[in-house]
Structures are given as C-alpha cells and as structure tokens.
C-alpha cells in the first residue's frame, strides 16, 4: 500500500493533476506472478536469470491471448527489472500476496487521501480503457490509471 501510495503521488505530481476524478489500480494477472516465481527458481547465485531458459519454462503456461505481452514482460523483467532489484530479489517475491484484496481493503484510505473515486481491478478483467495501462502491471507494482 505504501509503495502504491508513493507511486500514485508521483504520477499525479508529474502529470500536474491536483484533483483527480478517478484512480484505478490495475494489479498483475496470475500468469505474471507465476512467471516471477519461475524466474526465482531459475535464478543463479547472483540472482541472474537466462532469458531463453525463462521463456521456454513460462511461455507454455501463459494464456494464448497474452503470449506476445508475456514475451515482452519476460524480456523486460530479465533485462531491466532484475538488475535494478539487485541480488536476493527472489525473497521479495517468494510469497504471492493478493494485491487485489489488499488494495481493495484500502480503497477508503486512498479515497480519503486523494479525494476521488478509487477502484481496483485485475489486469485480466480490465475494461477496454484500462487494458493498455493494465499491460504495464507487474507483481507488487500495480499499473495506475488516473482520470
């Protein structure tokens, strides 16, 4: 919740939005969590993961409609996210949390802070205007849609 609060404040600040009408937190779909868990199992002692090994392990389990996005996500995760997280990143992702439930339980908190309607949706169930933004979600980093 703390990281999502900080991320939302940063987005509002960068976009120059003082009075948002609505904020939607779009949490990562199950297959992204599964991919991260697999990456953790494949990581070497330094926390590095071979992209080709991860792709061959994970792609068969990604829903057909998400294959292209899945390949892009895995590539970004291995080449950018893992190096920025540093050694030992796997421990942060070892337990899957129900982000949708946690953020849903915090709707009133966020609504009081930002003074607008707050909703939480899983990227798998995102409505048309949220789909592109939902594709940016990762485990522990929901996509944030502001209007």
Residue ranges and their predicted role:
Residues 1-147:
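Basic, alpha-helical terminal appendages of large translation-related enzymes
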